[in-house]
A protein has these predicted regions:
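Glycine-rich anion-binding loops and their surrounding alpha/beta cores
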Residues: 1-138
């Protein structure tokens, strides 16, 4: 239904995901149902791209401070394997959807490289600095 609505809105490429673990994103513990505008439904299996299966409980966060620490660790190329893999999987899908890569596997590989290098953390820090400067000028 959502994919049909996106198609009617004229979206060239859009993706709707439903992780079978009850997630609104791709997960690592089970397959993910994926609808791409104008295509037949797909089923994604994270193991296809060499990602290690992990239950949704492996992704549990906590309070604001703990979640911020998890985000920092993942964006700096640290964090648990499950945390890094789920971010790479969903980022890879997003990169493919945005037509930055030719396929989801290439998107996952690019996301893994960006995370491992710490470039994702550097980008977030640049965005924070820009936001502060903009806040000071307004």
């Amino acid at each position: 239904m959502m994919a049909t609505a996106l198609q009617r809105l004229g979206r060239k490429r859009a993706v709707v995901l439903h992780g079978r673990e009850g997630l609104d994103e791709a997960g690592l513990g089970d397959s993910t149902d994926m609808m791409v505008v104008g295509q037949e439904p797909h089923t994604l299996d994270p193991q296809t791209w060499g990602l290690t299966p992990a239950p949704v409980t492996a992704l549990a966060g906590g309070d604001v401070g703990e979640n911020a620490a998890i985000l920092q660790n993942v964006l700096q190329g640290r964090g648990t394997s499950a945390q890094r893999d789920v971010v790479a999987l969903n980022s890879g899908i997003a990169l493919w959807t945005a037509e930055r890569v030719d396929n989801i596997g290439a998107g996952i590989a690019l996301a893994q490289d960006i995370l491992a290098s710490g470039a994702a953390w550097d980008k977030l820090q640049a965005l924070i600095r820009l936001s502060r400067v903009q806040g000071e000028t307004n």
